[in-house]
Amino acid sequence: MASSSSLTLSQVIFSPSLPRHGSSSSSSPSLSFSTFSGLKSTPFTSSHRRILPSTTVTKQQFSVRASAAVETLEKTDAAIVEKSVNTIRFLAIDAVEKANSGHPGLPMGCAPMGHILYDEVMKYNPKNPYWFNRDRFVLSAGHGCMLQYALLHLAGYDSVQEDDLKSFRQWGSRIPGHPENFETPGVEVTTGPLGQGIANAVGLAVAEKHLAARFNKPDAEIVDHYTYVILGDGCQMEGISNEVCSLAGHWGLGKLIAFYDDNHISIDGDTEIAFTEDVSARFESLGWHVIWVKNGNTGYDEIRAAIKEAKAVKDKPTMIKVTTTIGFGSPNKANSYSVHGSGLGAKEVEATRNNLGWPYEPFHVPEDVKSHWSRHTPEGAALETEWNAKFAEYEKKYAEEAADLKSIITGELPAGWEKALPTYTPESPADATRNLSQQNLNALAKVLPGFLGGSADLASSNMTLLKMFGDFQKNTPEERNLRFGVREHGMGAICNGIALHSLGLIPYCATFFVFTDYMRGAMRISALSEAGVIYVMTHDSIGLGEDGPTHQPIEHLASFRAMPNILMFRPADGNETAGAYKVAVLKRKTPSILALSRQKLPQLAGTSIEGAAKGGYIVSDNSSGNKPDVILIGTGSELEIAVKAAEELKKEGKTVRVVSFVCWELYDEQSAEYKESVLPSSVTARVSIEAGSTFGWQKFVGDKGKAIGIDGFGASAPADKIYKEFGITAEAVVAAAKQVS
């Protein structure tokens, strides 16, 4: 438990944002390392995002700024801290009020911990939000995003100017209603659905622990940063938070510090109506160090002491339970659910201004507060310069490790990496695509330094084990096999955090395809936040057989095809599996799902890595003039059925084109000319076959075509029997082809 004794700021100099005197970097040459600035290789910026200029600091400037920073911190008094905290509160109040939408309660209650983190503890460079060795901050209770926006504004981030605060939650605003990493530089991950943020934070901390174990040397600590997260009662109630916090404790993520905003208020009222567990005891049982800050409203020294204590614990994550008052300072709405999700209203805003002694106009930042916070720009630039110099020395001593780390940071793939992908011929033995996937996973792990992942307790069924590596565990964090246990939702969100840590970290995760239902929330956020996770989903159809309809996906292909910014692959054999992996590795802003078979499938003639990359392509065709009698379209295990049906139709004198539709989304990206060459508009006789829902297939088969599939649940029986009973056969395809042609 945190000590209640009073501590001065000079007694708690644990802030990593202060350059150290006598640092070796002062005499080290400046490293011009543009790819590390987060500009040319910035992984998580949309095309409309502004490029942020790199800041360079000379040796002399560095020394002056370092001295000034220490002097400023030592002279900081309670008055400027209180004024800064109230500035944060009123920026949040004013933005919500102007937007007539938002959540002022959390920012008002959490402003003290937010201030201490951003002003006294965290290391970051406001002018380069993507500096690699920065501390990461995650607001898991994303509805309180005005807290983070106010902090970014005060800290000097270009992404949150006064005009941005005034356009909160408006069309085209850079500060949307919940934090979005692709909209606001300085926001690490996209949060909003409660529990996702704490899970992302675990992923960020996993990435730091893994990279530190691999690349740090006794004489060079090149990876050294913390992950801080604020979560609320709602996050605690969500099951995903328990999943990931269990793993965080098991893995001993000592550089993960979570602040639990313990305000006892939910949307429906006091948490007593539905949430009465002992959260501290639960976290202790999960292997966390737990501290209780009893006065989160004004107990600044208590918060500082708690952070200092947390940083002293190296072998486990820390939860700091901070008891706060939601809407602190509001005379009539504080400690009430009414301040959670709506503005205070003009009268209550005025009352709050009077109560907290705030005479300023809306959105005003007092000059002494501006001056106090202005040091973070030079300090941050100095920190990055110091790290760049340290990396330059590291690169001289450890060239191979430096090259791998640089690849991970920048996302620049090693030259010729794609040559590692296996290729197959029709003479290659038949195999399940889950087994072929494992061959690809292991091939990629040999050539991609940032490739890592695991399964939700199904590694031996999903075939996801990296054979040349051990398990990532508390004492072996340098290894690359992640054991997630039966925690699908947590697994997905942790991988989002890993992917968003560094562009060259390429995480994959696996379970049975049907159990994506347990992790869909994380997968949607992956697509939204442009996190290039690879989802290895096996047992992709009724082909899994006897386990029955609880384990047989039906609607899943269609549902993911409806989701924006995600690639839904269903490869038919080895070449298509390799093609899917090639695209998945290259598409770092788009997650990919590989739906893979349990049953063995033949290596088909005509398939290719290049064809799979186009999403849909011609596998075989005995017609001329781009006008076959009928086009058969198959995916995955049913491409073999389409090929067999084509052979039967050819025997009857038909000209038949077989098309493999590996990925609808990639096919849609192709030119109109290419699509016309594959599915000519003049040929309306089309039949699709897929062991799943027929929903959406009309787009490709047209009104005159026919989609063969399954629009009900499956059954428990041997796979061959189920295929026959559901009409997923070559005979059914032949009959349909004759009907439409």
From Swiss-Prot:
Transmembrane segments: none
EC number of the protein: 2.2.1.1
Co-factor note (free text): Binds 1 Mg(2+) ion per subunit. Can also utilize other divalent metal cations, such as Ca(2+), Mn(2+) and Co(2+). Binds 1 thiamine pyrophosphate per subunit.
Entry keyword Methyltransferase: no
Binding residues annotated for Mg(2+), in chain numbering: 233, 263, 265
Cellular component terms (Gene Ontology): chloroplast thylakoid membrane; cytosol
Cofactors required: Mg(2+); Ca(2+); Mn(2+); Co(2+)
GO MF terms, alphabetically ordered: metal ion binding; transketolase activity
Keywords linked to the UniProt accession: Calcium, Chloroplast, Magnesium, Membrane, Metal-binding, Plastid, Thiamine pyrophosphate, Thylakoid, Transferase, Transit peptide
Location in or out of the cell: Plastid, Chloroplast thylakoid membrane
Residues given in the record as substrate binding sites: 103, 340, 434, 461, 539, 547, 598
Transit peptide: 1-67
Uppermost EC category: transferase
Site feature Important for catalytic activity, where: 103, 340
Highest taxon above the source species: Eukaryota
Reactions listed under catalytic activity: D-sedoheptulose 7-phosphate + D-glyceraldehyde 3-phosphate = aldehydo-D-ribose 5-phosphate + D-xylulose 5-phosphate
UniProt pathway annotation: Carbohydrate biosynthesis; Calvin cycle
Residue numbers annotated as active site: 488
Function: Catalyzes the reversible transfer of a two-carbon ketol group from fructose-6-phosphate or sedoheptulose-7-phosphate to glyceraldehyde-3-phosphate to yield xylulose-5-phosphate and erythrose-4-phosphate or ribose-5-phosphate, respectively.
Complex formation: Homodimer.
Record protein name field: Transketolase, chloroplastic
Organism annotation: Solanum tuberosum
